[in-house]
């Protein structure tokens, strides 16, 4: 539960990502919360309390992400939200839901790593992760902008992107 960042036990997550190096943040994003989701699949798939916890996590993560000004903390709050989808899918416990959770975990590793690397390159080039201090970077960092937009569309479940497919599987279940 702690590793899955279930509120109130997930308070460590938004503080850990800004403190880590970019490569450390990518590694943590890829493995720490996903191992907890895997453990939940193995131990308590189909538990109704996980549905409630997953929905709470999804809402909690999005609300705090909207209020955040630091790019790395924003991505950390979105991890809580995305893992919330996965936890709710584990709680459903159907074959389709579990397949959707596994697909979403894999997709999440890909697009969240892309977003963290893009944020890391912006941090390296500008020296700040404050969103209010960034602007016009598409002129000086066009490739980073393209890759970050791809990651953003995927996390938003835009059609034809990986996040759309994996979240659709879980929602359909």
Regions found by a protein language model. Give the residues of each.
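Hydrophobic transmembrane alpha-helices and their helix-loop junctions in integral membrane proteins
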Residues: 1-173
């Amino acid at each position: 539960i702690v590793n899955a960042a279930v509120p109130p036990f997930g308070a460590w997550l938004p503080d850990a990502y800004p403190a880590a190096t970019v490569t450390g943040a990518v590694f943590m994003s890829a493995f720490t919360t996903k191992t907890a989701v895997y453990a939940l699949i193995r131990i308590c798939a189909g538990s109704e309390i996980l549905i409630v916890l997953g929905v709470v996590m999804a809402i909690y993560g999005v609300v705090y992400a909207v209020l955040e000004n630091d790019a790395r903390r924003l991505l950390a709050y979105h991890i809580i939200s995305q893992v919330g989808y996965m936890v709710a899918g584990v709680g459903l416990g159907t074959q389709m839901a579990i397949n959707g959770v596994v697909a979403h975990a894999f997709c999440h590793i890909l697009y969240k790593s892309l977003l963290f690397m893009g944020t890391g390159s912006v941090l390296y080039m500008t020296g700040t992760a404050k969103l209010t201090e960034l602007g016009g970077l598409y002129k000086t960092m066009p490739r980073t902008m393209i890759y970050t937009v791809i990651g953003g569309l995927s996390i938003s479940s835009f059609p034809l992107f990986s996040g759309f497919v994996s979240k659709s599987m879980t929602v359909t279940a």
